[in-house]
């Protein structure tokens, strides 16, 4: 899931990769032969060190190599530093990032950065926050499975907001891809993450926030205060966060915003429940989505009636003309129904072999859970919060100018 929706194009001779070799690069001597190979390239547009483990001294040597070799520094478009700290202590990770992140800011054409599968956590958040806020050239940021938690997630959201302001000042295009899955972002990160995403509304096409333990109020907050402003959204992946009816209603209101751009919608394992599923699928009967190719809706307690009353009529109306991949397994569907037979005839790879039984106790408890006041969307003074963030931006700029004058 922590992958781009496209394959970046590079000339083979301009790629330096030691990906997946499980090298233990601790000292400068450990990494020296690889840096010599890197420096020998006439041009390097992609650097891939993923699947190795790097220490502080080796990180310093790597940063120096990038900085001192213009054919690397001036040419880099993509950097993959995923899974780079296996078996490293937290102090080593922090010290490594102190060398690597600043040198990435010196690469004027670096657009794609993958930092996934590294145990960053709270100790590294200041370094990451500063890097993200000032990486004005970046277009595609992948930060998945980094052990963030809600507090770090909130600060990532603030960093995205500051990045947008810095991009505006530098006349650089906004972020196009933000992937931040498996990070335990939970509800606590939702407000500022929403504001951060909103600030890139003119650019963002891909947002993936799967497996973050976000509850209905947090999901609703993300959509209402952030995602609904992304007019060009093509791929939205919220898999394995919890919706229920409340967040489903907010999503249903936002969906028409993306009717012309949406290519893929992943709501697998989101527990929209029967009522929430109804609300979402009703949108497809009312609004045409001419570019929607992929719809993932597994394990959501969707009822057979939703398929028959909303989804099939939407298909018959021609409201989903390009839909080619459908996932609806694990819902409350009728295995022997004509409706499923019809869908299987339309979608060759459709899997419908896991059906959830309807439990009378589930039906009785569903309405009660969906009326939980704690899960409803909270009214937030976003204008005030955005103003406060802008004031922080001005203070930060003043501090940096002062530091420059002192030097």
From Swiss-Prot:
Protein name: Ran GTPase-activating protein 1
Segments annotated as LRR repeats: 11-39, 40-67, 68-101, 102-133, 134-166, 167-197, 198-226, 227-256, 257-285, 286-315, 316-346
Job of this protein: GTPase activator for the nuclear Ras-related regulatory protein GSP1 (Ran), converting it to the putatively inactive GDP-bound state.
Region (Disordered): 353-378
Disruption phenotype: Causes conditional lethality. Strains bearing this mutation do not grow at temperatures exceeding 30 degrees Celsius.
GO BP field: nuclear export; protein import into nucleus; ribosomal subunit export from nucleus; RNA import into nucleus; subtelomeric heterochromatin formation; tRNA export from nucleus
Outcome, altering residue 17 to F: In mutant RNA1-1
Gene Ontology cellular component annotations, sorted alphabetically: chromosome, telomeric region; cytosol; nucleus; perinuclear region of cytoplasm
tRNA processing keyword on record: no
Note: Present with 52200 molecules/cell in log phase SD medium.
SMART domains: LRR_RI
GO molecular function, one term: small GTPase binding
Residues bearing PTM Phosphoserine: 360
Subcellular location: Cytoplasm
The family this protein is said to belong to: Belongs to the RNA1 family.
Alphabetic keyword roster: Cytoplasm, GTPase activation, Leucine-rich repeat, Phosphoprotein, Repeat
